[in-house]
Amino acid sequence: MQKLVHYRGNLAHGAVLRFPGSYPHEKYVDLMLVEFPDSDRKFGFVVSTGHKAGLILVKLPKEAEAVGSAGIDRQWLIDNWNAWIYESAKVGDVYVAQHYPVPVRAEL
């Protein structure tokens, strides 16, 4: 994972953001960028950790979409972090990964 503010390129579905959380979330929160193909708001974030896992946090506005690629514009995300994504976390504390790693083996 690397800091979002240093990440190069835009974000595609499956990208994971990790940052310090606050109530009602846990100490750290992961969000996954998801695509809603049958919606006028094509991209959004789903909480992927803790008690809120599986819940849609936000559907992003059309202006968040990247031009020329399927995903969202990294600079739009940085500029609009506190207004659209998470008010109490600093964008400088947000880390990004292209996706979760595939486990080497599964333990059930």
Model-derived segments and their meaning:
Residues M1-K3, G21, H25, D38, ...:
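Generic low-complexity segments that are intrinsically disordered, proline-rich and/or Lys/Arg-biased
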